[in-house]
């Protein structure tokens, strides 16, 4: 049983695939899945993307620096939205960030993070890495290491890592486990290069799993055979 996990989710989890904004049904599903693992006393940190609000690659007229900063603020909007919904559903939540000083957001101090976890709070890390040119995958890797997570769980729309796109190839083969070196040798795209490098350097395990299969997150935290586990060796 993992006692401390970092959960990385895309903004699409909040809106639905290909949609924008917030889908209440999706968010209540997220609430229910989180409640299942919090009942076991697992500490949960969350990094959420902002694709439900803004995608920089769709705004070619913007400079990359400005587009990335807008994306960072998008993650702050998502974090505050989740905090309010979570707390209305009896999930104590704190949002921490290095890019915002709004009254509902606290600065990131890692001594405080442990206190939040000890007090039973969910911790949402907003604002990415606080620097442009880095993805929320990289932010998730960084926060997972900093909060001393047992594992980084990447919730996706597919049930793991395949040798090729399972939507295009019926003979695609799913991996149950991989080492970092095997993933690199096979050219598998698990996270962006910077995120993968951080996890590899600090021996952070990564689990890629289907977040939309009910109770999959609980199975993952119980260390059951779910998704694809990427391990140091």
Curated annotation (Swiss-Prot):
GO terms for biological process: 'de novo' CTP biosynthetic process; UDP biosynthetic process. GO terms for molecular function: ATP binding; UMP kinase activity. It is found in: Cytoplasm. Pfam families: AA_kinase. Pathway: Pyrimidine metabolism; CTP biosynthesis via de novo pathway; UDP from UMP (UMPK route): step 1/1. UMP binds at residues 68, 129-136. Its EC number is 2.7.4.22. One of its GO terms (cellular component) is cytoplasm. It comes from the Bacteria. The keyword Aminoacyl-tRNA synthetase does not apply. Gene3D superfamilies: Acetylglutamate kinase-like. The keyword Zinc does not apply. It catalyses: UMP + ATP = UDP + ADP. Keywords: ATP-binding, Cytoplasm, Kinase, Nucleotide-binding, Pyrimidine biosynthesis, Transferase. Its main location: cytoplasm. Inhibited by UTP. ATP binds at residues 8-11, 51, 55, 156, 162, 165. Belongs to the UMP kinase family. Catalyzes the reversible phosphorylation of UMP to UDP. Homohexamer. This is Uridylate kinase. It comes from Thermosipho melanesiensis (strain DSM 12029 / CIP 104789 / BI429). The lineage of its organism: Bacteria, Thermotogati, Thermotogota, Thermotogae, Thermotogales.
């Amino acid at each position: 049983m993992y006692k401390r996990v970092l959960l990385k989710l895309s903004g699409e989890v909040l809106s639905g695939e290909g949609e924008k904004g917030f889908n209440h049904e999706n968010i209540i599903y997220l609430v229910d899945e989180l409640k299942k693992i919090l009942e076991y006393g697992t500490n949960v940190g969350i990094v959420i993307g902002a694709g439900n609000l803004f995608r920089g690659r769709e705004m070619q007229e913007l400079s990359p620096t400005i587009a990335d900063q807008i994306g960072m603020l998008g993650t702050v909007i998502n974090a505050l939205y989740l905090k309010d919904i979570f707390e209305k559903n009896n999930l104590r939540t704190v949002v921490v960030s290095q890019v915002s000083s709004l009254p509902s957001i606290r600065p990131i101090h890692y001594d405080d993070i442990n206190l939040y976890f000890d007090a039973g709070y969910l911790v949402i890390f907003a604002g990415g890495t606080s620097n442009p040119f880095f993805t929320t995958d990289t932010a998730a890797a960084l926060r997972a290491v900093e909060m001393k997570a047992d594992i980084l769980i990447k919730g996706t729309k597919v049930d793991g890592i395949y040798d090729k796109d399972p939507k295009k190839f019926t003979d695609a083969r799913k991996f149950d486990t991989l080492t970092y070196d095997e993933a690199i040798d096979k050219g598998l795209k698990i996270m962006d290069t910077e995120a993968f490098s951080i996890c590899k350097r600090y021996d952070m395990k990564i689990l890629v799993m289907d977040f939309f299969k009910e109770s999959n997150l609980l199975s993952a935290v119980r260390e059951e055979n779910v998704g694809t586990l990427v391990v140091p060796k």
